[in-house]
Regions:
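Conserved beta-strand signature within the Rossmann-like core of class I S-adenosyl-L-methionine
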Residues: 64-72
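Short catalytic micro-motifs in class I SAM-dependent methyltransferases
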Residues: 41-42
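Class I SAM-dependent methyltransferase SAM/SAH-binding core
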Residues: 1-27
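A conserved beta-strand element that flanks and buttresses the S-adenosyl-L-methionine
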Residues: 38
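Short, glycine-/aromatic-enriched active-site segment of Class I SAM-dependent methyltransferases
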Residues: 72-91
């Protein structure tokens, strides 16, 4: 699921076996709930990403299902802090790791874990957060 038709078309070119949906993530619901939702570099493009976390928890995941989120744009990753200005993408939200963890907790996720992958120099790495419904 992606809000960009260009990304959907690219995915279809690279992988003809699976189904892809172009939709606003806050409006879309799967026909059947799933066990795993993985997202990379998406959540901070939402004005209120906590609403998306709640929506996935309530409408996409089975009981015991897992959300896995990866983002590079977060406060502790200093080189990413000026992306909003560098890219002129005004909707990018910058939050701390603790704020992202609070979004998961508030939605109801349990067994929440977080870590950074790919740390190198000033680059703090991709922040990965996962939790279970």
């Amino acid at each position: 699921v992606d809000g960009s038709i260009q990304m959907i078309e690219k995915a279809k070119r690279l992988d003809k076996k699976n189904n892809y949906f172009c939709s606003d993530l806050l409006d879309w619901n799967p026909k059947e709930k799933v066990d795993i939702v993985h997202s990379m570099e998406v959540f901070y493009y939402f004005k209120k990403p906590e609403i998306l976390v709640n929506h996935i928890y309530n409408n996409w995941l089975n009981e015991g299902g897992r959300l896995i989120m990866g983002i590079d744009h977060y406060k502790e990753n200093k080189p990413s802090n000026n992306w909003k200005e560098e890219t002129s993408i005004s909707i990018m939200q910058l939050f701390s790791e603790n704020t992202w963890l609070d979004f998961f907790k508030t939605a109801g996720f349990v067994n929440i874990e977080s870590w950074c992958f790919g740390k190198e120099g000033e680059w703090n790495g991709t922040l990965i957060i996962t939790g279970i419904k």
